[in-house]
């Protein structure tokens, strides 16, 4: 059996060896909750990777959004090139959930665009868990949403070997039960085709490789893997396991039982609605549900099948749904990254989902069993956990209360120390700020300024522009692509000061930033809480000249705690550096990578703008259609490489081109 093998030029330094040893010891001793309190830039991902290598267990890494999950997945793939590092996030590029607005009698049907690549990666993740133990899955919070039964998923998996007695038509029936679709012309993921005694299957978890099964009578003669594009044979296989094409598969017996159970629930609900005089709702529900039942009987599938997941899996009402967590073996470990954000997000998922379903059930769009197609409640989530390590620079009260050990990682490999903090009175703050900005600009350094309101941010930006400072304002309406471009321009020195309200979102750990100015630091609220302040202070921790200025007339409790905690860390870091003769260095590594990524985004944008203006106008309808196909290929390629921002940009260009047809 393959083992986790970490490949890296790094050696653990600073606090890392102690943190790795203590966290590993905690897991081996069976401790359920631990916290890695790691400051910005201390190499938390490397510590996580070393712990995984030490304990050799399947691992789930939970991140609070897709972008962060993609970053982590790329890092873990670099650390573990020989192991299965998988990616599991919501596969919707665009998702409008089903909803009903009673005030205007508006029913909004579920509308979504499923990203084929991400769907493939999800299948790759679940199938890896059944095939091996050296698996790391990096997931967003969408992994606590309902998924089909792992038992049915595994039971329907087909295992084939050369020499096996197996009728070709029997294998075809099995594939159809697993929701594979026969298509002899358009061969794609989740489909199969038949040519005489040769059956070719394109597994749901693959992008470019398919399986060819050759029969001789009732016996499998040969199994080969081939490249779908070139047709070239990659190699012969002694065994192949084909996993279902959907996570919502069920056995024939369970499907029969499910249909009977749906019919019984429908009859009961219709009685209730009619007794309340809700005849329109009753008629609507009957019409919609009967259509779904008919589809299930004929096809084994229907639109919105997830709303019947409780019936399909045979679970009692109100019981927790199956999720990705159920696909893991019992001894798995879990890292919850940026836990101070991720844990509250997990808590909020259930209530938001229930509120939307209330109106759908009340007005006859769905049966009450639709409530059971839902995310886990927080209590159910806790019950499914085995051993967890919370990872954050500012763990929340939940993590601190639950953890049997809190392991600090305060020393950075670069020797950088936390920034010094100065509190300045509000009177004359703008003139003082301008003076500080000019000092930084002379040294070719950058400045972040955080305000509390949009109005304040806009006014400040205008004022700074008027006095000759190169400044930009980043607000919440800016999309990811533009955001990356603004960050790129800041790093390249196209402007010197970035003003924003919430500068805590990912991607703003910039080595060039030597000053963070916090306006209205003494106003109580979530943007000026202890956690937010510490996270904001961390934005200046990647530069050797890092400094934070808080503009305030009084020192609030949150400010005092943030200042004390920063000074405590600073003292430890300075003492360590003096003891080991370390001279702090501004972070250099990674600048080029980030600039490359963002430059290419900008180049793509410029390329498409030029193409659109100069070429598209002169294209025929057929040429535009051909160009759209090329862009779709490029979009899929970018998604495979986890370059979701670039892929989204190409997708937007496709939408614009389709409007011209």
Swiss-Prot record:
Residues 429-591 form the Helicase C-terminal domain. Residues 625-660 form the UVR domain. One of its GO terms (cellular component) is excinuclease repair complex. InterPro entries: Helicase/UvrB_N, Helicase_ATP-bd, Helicase_C-like, P-loop_NTPase, UVR_dom, UVR_dom_sf, UvrB, UvrB_inter. It is found in: Cytoplasm. The beta-hairpin motif is involved in DNA binding. NCBIfam families: PRK05298.1 (NF003673), uvrb (TIGR00631). This is UvrABC system protein B.
